[in-house]
Amino acid sequence: MPLQLLLLLILLGPGNSLQLWDTWADEAEKALGPLLARDRRQATEYEYLDYDFLPETEPPEMLRNSTDTTPLTGPGTPESTTVEPAARRSTGLDAGGAVTELTTELANMGNLSTDSAAMEIQTTQPAATEAQTTQPVPTEAQTTPLAATEAQTTRLTATEAQTTPLAATEAQTTPPAATEAQTTQPTGLEAQTTAPAAMEAQTTAPAAMEAQTTPPAAMEAQTTQTTAMEAQTTAPEATEAQTTQPTATEAQTTPLAAMEALSTEPSATEALSMEPTTKRGLFIPFSVSSVTHKGIPMAASNLSVNYPVGAPDHISVKQCLLAILILALVATIFFVCTVVLAVRLSRKGHMYPVRNYSPTEMVCISSLLPDGGEGPSATANGGLSKAKSPGLTPEPREDREGDDLTLHSFLP
């Protein structure tokens, strides 16, 4: 119980705005000695389960708690007036379906000392997603429409480190085995590639989840200029192609007149203008904040995915309409054939009647009957003969039992 109270006092100290229930259950199980000895940054451990990656290694070094700074800016921030709203919260779904809250401000991170010379270092595990470390001042909002701007707030000594010299241009270089390559013309100012072990793959699944993954060997150095905007422009015939792994399905290309401006002024806004005709028309604005998952800093993004009606939807609708039309034609042909056959059968019934007797048949049958008194005989015109013998009247009753009379009448 005293251990929990001491941990609560440390977490609720000046400069930390962490919730009580966020740390009571998760931080109580951690050892307090190593945390105090290393002076680590205290952070809550929501179960931010990732869909594809489950870290199973030891947690890395945590960041430092500076309790003498304000939640908005660090002691070495270049310009504190360009900070976006500090309490901008974003909600996303974790693997268990629970709604997790990710803030880009230092509310759930603790106060971070962000001097331009000493920045915090975040290392990612081999299965962790791409760790984008954020300064308190800039925040990243990647908007992929043509007029949108991407505000990246990254720390400078992390796996994706931003250094801010005065006249440096942004140069991102890679060995030949890089999996992601942004190729521009010789007038392009930036070539983004990764190390041989780098796997920064922007993969867009049917659920439209974009996961940017980089192993620890991937070191992406972004050097920014504080007073000038760096514009990455491509010629009309040059397009920016991000070649991903075999599982990657999203290709980001720039249109003819589109220019990708990576501006990291003191406000650290990076404008990524990309072609709106990317695969499946994904317009994915996301804001990245640095959170920890079981002690591992990782990039968590709020993916607000808009699905415009693209070409595959039109194709599927057209195919469905074509199938319905074919079935309707088959049903119509069947109905017409049925009506025609019914009409023809009814006309044949009238042309060929079932029974058509003539009086000659009756005459021929009656001529075979004997003239004796075996019943009344029919004359030529169908009348009955009146010649009867009174003595033979009882015999026809005996002979008429069954069909004997008819058989004897036809025999010679």
UniProtKB/Swiss-Prot annotation:
Keyword Glycoprotein: yes
Propeptide: 18-41
Phosphoserine modified-residue sites: S409
One GO MF term attached to the UniProt entry: signaling receptor binding
GO biological process, one term: leukocyte migration
Keyword Transcription found: no
Residues bearing PTM Pyrrolidone carboxylic acid: Q42
InterPro entries cross-referenced by the UniProt entry: PSGL-1
Biased composition (Basic and acidic residues): 395-406
Location(s), subcellular: Membrane
Transmembrane segment boundaries: 321-341
Disordered as annotated region, ranges: 56-95, 125-146, 166-252, 374-412
Protein name, per record: P-selectin glycoprotein ligand 1
